[in-house]
Amino acid sequence: MKNLLLITFFVVSTVTALGGRGSKSALVLVAARSSENHPLHATDPITIWCAPDNPQVVIKTAHFIRSSDNEKLEAALNPTKKNATYTFGSPSVKDAGEYKCELDTPHGKISHKVFIYSRPVVHSHEHFTEHEGHEFHLESTGTTVEKGESVTLTCPVTGYPKPVVKWTKDSAPLALSQSVSMEGSTVIVTNANYTDAGTYSCEAVNEYTVNGKTSKMLLVVDKMVDVRSEFQWVYPLAVILITIFLLVVIIVFCEWRNKKSTSKA
């Protein structure tokens, strides 16, 4: 009877303490440009896994659920049925994020979170070029506005964990004012003045730990803003009018000389 009670106590303790363990992986990325239609892919496959924290517990069925879109991924079990895995042959930045591993065991269900991390990358249809050959320092095409107009500067970055974004202007921290404000990670310049022209840089940073090593990842995106005079169109027009005037003067002068020469003859 005593032995039976001990066995019962052991089984109950095992079931109550049932938990899981799982993987933490990171995408290996060698570029920083991605878009919805052409997501950036990692250079290596990634296998996520999870298992009961009690090595004696076997798994009956298992699957992973991606938290971002609730997509269900059927897991494969190893021969001993003590580990569940799913392999992404060519993972993209859209696969980064949190996954819930759900295991069904003879002792009950286990739920555990696993993670795929991604450094910050640009995720946009905008055109970007590498700054001086640095793949994680990008430049966008410049924006030109007239004095008094408004301009909106976005920082279209993605990554997991979600990157922390800060802005600088001409390598100094961005100073907010009545004309320069922020909504989330977007900079809005209203009633632009000549002093608002310059290089606005979005700096996106995230940090994660894989296999005991903590990585802090940085992406810099430069956006140039040029503010021109609202009367700038007058200058080319003035040049054209002056040119026409000079041509008319030359033609009239030539005609006058021709007439004068003819009258002398």
UniProtKB/Swiss-Prot annotation:
Where in the cell?
A: Cell membrane
- The domain of life for this entry's organism is Eukaryota
Phenotype caused by lack of the gene: No visible phenotype. No defect in the positioning of ASI and ASH neuron cell bodies. No defect in the positioning of PQV, PVP, RMEV, HSN and AVK axons in the ventral nerve cord. In a zig-2, zig-3, zig-4 or zig-5 or zig-8 mutant background, cell body positioning of ASI and ASH head neurons is normal.
- Protein name, entry field: Zwei Ig domain protein zig-1
Q: Where are glycans found on this sequence? A: N83, N193
Gene3D superfamilies linked to this entry: Immunoglobulins
Organism whose genome encodes this protein:
Caenorhabditis elegans
**Biological process terms in GO annotation:** axon guidance; dendrite self-avoidance; homophilic cell adhesion via plasma membrane adhesion molecules
Which InterPro entries would you find in this protein's record? Answer: Ig-like_dom, Ig-like_dom_sf, Ig-like_fold, Ig_sub, Ig_sub2
